[in-house]
């Protein structure tokens, strides 16, 4: 018997657009099957398929081997697909929220988001509530009893960080948390629900290169090991040909747990500083290249 798929496709329609900041809009989607969707973590990843010109709904193959056949479609017949965070799910109401970063018409996702109107349709590849197995589509898995949390993210990972902070705020005894958050401009510093033990540092990028404010903040707040004592030898990852994705050991008992996500080149530089210069335990840090400047990862 074939294994049950942990993800399935959901056809949804845009119900409402909520402007969160100059660069961030929340799309509220609705669909008859959303009641069968589930989320397993505050940084739950999903895929969004966008219609090609002339399509009302993205045309994606069905069946067990749909993804292979989707990838085999000619470029002009393959609906664009991008990764997003499932921000909030109200399954009983048939609603799901996805936050979109707006960066002009440079890509199909932002272009769709800029022009989207209520009733416009997309497909979501999201965890199937009918499947008892885990989707494994999230990485926020801190060890029990961790005392310090470090969150490092650019605006593409801000929806995930918002969910993480909400989870921490709901705890009786939340850990001390430092969140370094790079955004396009000062107006993107949205209000987030966070525990009293959290410090949120907003880093407007302005004209700086992607990830530069984030790297500088990490270097300023987490100094290199004293006396030049370096961490373990660190292999380099070519972020132009490989996906930078390293998950922490959720069973490791240690004082610090870090979650780092954003532009892959910046995450690579932050990884180098935290592990090589600061000598932190790589088993306590999750590194994720959510995107790579000049390259499509999906």
Cite the ranges covered by each PLM segment.
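Extended, composition-driven regions rather than compact fold-specific motifs
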Residues: 1-298
């Amino acid at each position: 018997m074939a294994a049950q798929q942990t993800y399935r496709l959901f056809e949804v329609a845009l119900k409402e657009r909520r402007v969160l900041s100059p660069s961030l809009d929340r799309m509220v989607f609705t669909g008859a099957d959303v009641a069968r969707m589930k989320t397993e973590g505050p940084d739950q990843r999903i895929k969004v398929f966008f219609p090609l010109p002339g399509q009302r709904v993205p045309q994606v193959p069905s069946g067990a081997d749909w993804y292979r056949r989707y990838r085999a479609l000619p470029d002009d017949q393959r609906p664009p697909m991008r990764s997003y965070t499932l921000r909030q799910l109200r399954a009983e109401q048939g609603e799901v929220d996805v936050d979109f970063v707006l960066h002009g018409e440079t890509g199909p996702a932002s272009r769709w988001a800029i022009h989207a109107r209520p009733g416009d349709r997309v497909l979501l590849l999201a965890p199937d509530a009918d499947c008892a197995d885990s989707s494994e589509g999230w990485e926020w898995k801190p060890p029990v009893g961790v005392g310090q949390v470090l969150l490092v993210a650019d605006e593409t990972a801000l929806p995930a960080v918002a969910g993480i902070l909400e989870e921490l705020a709901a705890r009786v005894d939340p850990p001390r948390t430092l969140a370094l958050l790079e955004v396009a401009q000062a107006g993107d510093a949205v209000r987030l629900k966070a525990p009293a033990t959290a410090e949120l540092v907003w880093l407007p990028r302005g004209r700086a290169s992607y990830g530069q404010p984030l790297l500088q903040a990490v270097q300023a707040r987490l100094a290199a090991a004293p006396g030049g004592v370096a961490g373990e030898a660190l292999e380099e990852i070519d972020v132009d040909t490989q996906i930078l994705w390293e998950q922490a050991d959720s069973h490791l008992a240690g004082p610090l747990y870090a979650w780092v996500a954003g532009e892959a080149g910046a995450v690579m530089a932050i990884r180098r500083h935290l592990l090589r210069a600061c000598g932190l335990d790589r088993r306590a840090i999750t590194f994720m290249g959510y995107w790579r400047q000049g390259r499509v990862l999906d």
